[in-house]
Amino acid sequence: NNCPPDWLPMNGLCYKIFDELKAWEDAERFCRKYKPGCHLASFHQYGESLEIAEYISDYHKGQAEVWIGLWDKKKDFSWEWTDRSCTDYLTWDKNQPDHYQNKEFCVELVSLTGYRLWNDQVCGSKNAFLCQCKF
């Protein structure tokens, strides 16, 4: 585990919640600038979702939803991760994703679900965000 003290180590990667509110693209840009190879976080199994949810509940200072690295680049419900990893696991909140008013193409962790479930949201909304890095 080479993660810095305030990062969560999991499956060879390190995760950190940032409370500063940013639009989705700005959040992804922030993660990338933090260190080469960093992105908004991607998830590949239920266990990861639970561990991240617990970590965010413990460390997130605020009520904001939290951006992750999933987005619908083509705007056709074909969700992709910014780290180009395989979209092999999805855990949507009830009745989501819905592309509400054809404007929601970025994905957030929903605070009311304890950050366990996902919602598609307007990419320009300001949220906290979760970066994932290799150190």
UniProtKB/Swiss-Prot annotation:
Residues 10-132 form the C-type lectin domain. Ca(2+) binds at residues 96, 98, 104, 119-120. A motif (Galactose-binding) lies at residues 96-98. Pfam families: Lectin_C (PF00059). Expressed by the venom gland. Signal peptide: none annotated. GO terms for cellular component: extracellular region; protein-containing complex. The keyword Chaperone does not apply. Disulfide bonds join 3-14, 31-131, 38-133, 106-123. CDD domains: CLECT_REG-1_like. GO terms for biological process: calcium-dependent cell-cell adhesion via plasma membrane cell adhesion molecules; heterophilic cell-cell adhesion via plasma membrane cell adhesion molecules; venom-mediated blood agglutination in another organism; venom-mediated perturbation of biological process. PROSITE patterns: C_TYPE_LECTIN_1 (PS00615), C_TYPE_LECTIN_2 (PS50041). It is found in: Secreted. Gene3D superfamilies: Mannose-Binding Protein A, subunit A. Belongs to the true venom lectin family. Galactose-binding lectin which recognizes specific carbohydrate structures and agglutinates a variety of animal cells by binding to cell-surface glycoproteins and glycolipids. This is a calcium-dependent lectin. Shows high hemagglutinating activity (MHC is 0.25 ug/ml on rabbit erythrocytes). Homodimer; disulfide-linked. This is C-type lectin PAL.
